[in-house]
């Protein structure tokens, strides 16, 4: 686990700029793949995605009766796992830009008490200040147009002392991670074309290639106002789990 101190000042210019794709383009793309999203996630991750998701939920440190926000919630699995931790007395909200993905989540988990899903923009979350104990985002940060603003909105939505967590695909460093990068670059587009969604999975590859290093993401989180920022590489560094704390106000 790698950490940066709370008073760390990143060197050099820093914009926190994110994905260049427009919100409309991203929304339409995810609407189109909503029905295939979960299966494709399993294939693309070589069946590792459920394990990574468990690590994210564990790190949130939620207790029964707690509350959580899941940003870029997709088909709702992370939010559902968070709800299983807080129980019927707790509250979990999933927010996603795509109406198609949100509809899948709403249908799938409509009978779960304390669990809800809304269409919303991560750049302007439909939440009150300090509303939740924790906020998560899994494989969604690289789709945002401004990473710093995304983290800042998550931090705004979490109470002082609460956690903000980000699970995302990382740049390759280990041999295993380099193999997985080859998998993403060469095999994932083929899987997408076979599934009839070639452009969408070509976008996936480009967004992974453009995503900053784990060290840079940690700096951006600190710039967004989070403290005790740290990150852990999972499965040989294929993905990284970033964690930060909302400071006491």
Feature map (PLM): residue ranges:
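Core SAM-dependent methyltransferase catalytic element
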Residues: 227, 233-249
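A short glycine-rich, Lys/Arg-flanked "PGG" loop and its adjoining helix->strand segment in the class I
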Residues: 148-163
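A short acidic, Gly/Pro-enriched loop at the edge of an enzyme's catalytic core
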Residues: 123-135
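Class I SAM-dependent methyltransferase SAM/SAH-binding core
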Residues: 67-124
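Conserved alpha-helix/loop element of class I SAM-dependent methyltransferases that forms part
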Residues: 46-64, 81
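A short SAM/SAH-binding and catalytic strip from SAM-dependent methyltransferases
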Residues: 133-147
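Helix-to-beta-strand junctions that scaffold the AdoMet/dcAdoMet cofactor pocket
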Residues: 87, 144-145, 158-159
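C-terminal alpha-helical "lid/dimerization" subdomain adjacent to the S-adenosyl-L-methionine
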Residues: 167, 171-220, 224, 230
